[in-house]
Swiss-Prot record:
A Pfam family that the UniProt record links to this protein: Autophagy_act_C
UniProt protein name: Ubiquitin-like-conjugating enzyme ATG3
Localization in the cell: Cytoplasm
Entry annotation: catalytic residues: 267 (glycyl thioester intermediate)
Source domain of life: Eukaryota
One GO cellular component, as annotated: cytosol
One GO BP annotation of this record: autophagosome assembly
Region named Disordered: 137-165
């Protein structure tokens, strides 16, 4: 029944998006929405700092006229997913995630409650040295090591050592080597039997601009160790159960042919971003629109906690 409701909603929103005029004037600070031009600027900033992300054009027949032909959406491939969400349900790791998001589900609450009070903790890592200099600890999508960030070497986050030890930060390539991850899975299985099998999956992640909601929108499609497409039910295993079929639905990518993908619905993105902007302002800082996608990738982590695109980065604004 929920799938039928989602299908009807998707069709209605598709018509609404077609009829919605393109946002021309910036309303980022006031409402948390962005124009197509601001989306491109934020995307350029993401690609610059995180070379695993790149711009793509998609099918020519599906090009959106309000975006440059070669910058229709953002893409990162082969992002690892080492375990299923159910394996986190009663783990210390999940407790940390819940604690990080204010004990009430954080960003999850923004989809089930009328307010967005819980999202304040989503920017807990933002610290203000002074009104003109803001050091931000931002978790971003599969960021590779970039030589132009001198500040990255100072004051690394507590979990950076774990990432370095895992070897996930040893490559600057735009994609991860899935064959190595598959070999690792086999080694684990041989060493510890069935219980030790590392069920590695990989995901391709996409960020599009939603003209109706005037915000970015995240899409994802998964593969098993042999690079065979996952079923819908299998992909749902890697998504927080608080969001399956509610915040996350199966829809067709606006720029690509089938199959359909999982999509994080953007109905509350602007509301969350507005709260973050206000939180930063209360601390004496100012959040630039070019940082939008870096922040966006942080707060959607609550939806896909097992997909490992969160490499901690430090940025100074």
């Amino acid at each position: 029944m929920q799938n039928v409701i989602n299908s009807v909603k998707g069709t209605a929103l598709g018509v609404a998006e077609f009829l919605t005029p393109v946002l021309k004037e910036s309303k980022f600070k006031e409402t948390g929405v962005i124009t197509p031009e601001e989306f491109v600027a934020a995307g350029d900033h993401l690609v610059h700092h995180c070379p695993t992300w790149k711009w793509a054009s998609g099918e020519e027949a599906k090009v959106k006229p309000y975006l440059p032909n070669d910058k229709q959406f953002l893409l990162t491939r082969n992002v690892p997913c080492y375990k299923r969400c159910k394996q986190m349900e009663y783990s210390d790791e999940l407790e940390a995630i819940i604690e990080e998001d204010d004990g009430d589900g954080g960003w999850v609450d923004t989809f089930h409650n009328s307010g967005v009070t819980g999202v304040t903790e989503a920017v807990r890592e933002i610290s203000l040295d002074n009104k003109d200099n803001m050091n931000m600890n931002v978790k971003t999508g599969a960021c590779g090591n970039s030589g132009d960030d001198d500040d990255d070497e100072e004051g690394e986050a507590a979990d950076m050592e774990e990432y370095e030890e895992s070897g996930l930060l040893e490559t600057d390539d735009a994609t991860l080597d899935t064959s190595k991850m598959a070999d690792l899975s086999k080694t684990k299985a041989e060493a510890g039997g069935e219980d030790a099998i590392l069920q590695t999956r990989t995901y391709d992640l996409y960020i599009t601009y939603d003209k109706y909601y005037q915000t970015p929108r995240l899409w994802l499609f998964g593969y098993d160790e042999d690079r065979q497409p996952l079923t819908v039910d299998q992909m749902y295993e890697d998504i927080s159960q608080d969001h399956v079929k509610k915040t996350v639905t199966i829809e067709n990518h606006p720029n690509l042919p089938p199959p359909a993908m999982c999509s994080v619905h953007p109905c509350r993105h602007a509301e969350v971003m507005k709260k973050i902007i206000e939180t930063v302002a209360e601390g004496g800082g100012e959040l630039g629109v070019h940082m939008y996608l870096l922040i966006f990738l942080k707060f959607v982590q609550a939806v896909i906690p097992t997909i490992e695109y969160d490499y901690t980065r430090h940025f100074t604004m």
